[in-house]
Amino acid sequence: ERETRELLLETADILGADHIKIGNINGYPREVGDIRRKFADISDEFAQVDTQVGLEFFPVDPNINTIADAMEITEGIDNGGLYLDLWHNVKMDIDFNEIANLSSGDVVGAEFQDGYIDTNMSFIEETINLRKIPGEGEFPISDWISATRESGFDEPFALEILSEEYRRLSIEVAYQKAHDGGSQFL
């Protein structure tokens, strides 16, 4: 873990990264106090290279089920905050009003895509193969963008498109489709 963190610190410094995101994609159960301490330590380390740390939370994480759970970990920690991902927010049935009620500075990064509310696929299969170009699914993208902006987040939004069909496109076509799909919601 230490070696990986050092590599990420060096990379963030070289690239001048605005932020990184971390989370519990493997779904390990942990005590909230332990997670908060670790998040604070990582945030302090990355402050040395002027890179914010965002906590991304997932449906498979048994420690975070709500915005309030996530805020219990990040609130009051300098150089850290939430990293919102529409995909996970929809799959976790996060109330967008809770996002809108966050304070300026609570969110350090945000990414979106489109997808389907319900499928018969496993979490992993759906996550890597059904994150669609915005406008090609049924996610309430405009509502989520509005809520995220209402929270005071005024940084650029990222796209995270992971789908089998998207990976088959040429780079030129993929970039254009991503740009056109994403920009219609911003």
Locations of the language-model features?
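Gly/Pro-rich active-site loop or hairpin
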Residues: 32, 64-71, 88-154, 163, ...
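Hydrophobic faces of well-ordered beta-strands that scaffold small-molecule active sites
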Residues: 20-22, 53-55, 80-84, 108-112, ...
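C-terminal helical cap(s) of enzyme catalytic domains, especially alpha/beta-barrels
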Residues: 168-186
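Soluble or luminal CAZymes and related metallo-dependent hydrolases
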Residues: 3-4, 34, 38, 136-140, ...
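Active-site acidic/histidine proton-transfer and metal-coordination neighborhood
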Residues: 1-81
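Amphipathic alpha-helical segments that form well-ordered structural scaffolds
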Residues: 11, 41, 143, 147, ...
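Conserved hydrophobic residues forming the short capping helix/wall of the S-adenosyl-L-methionine
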Residues: 46, 74-77, 148, 182, ...
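Conserved, mostly hydrophobic/aromatic
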Residues: 12, 53, 85, 110, ...
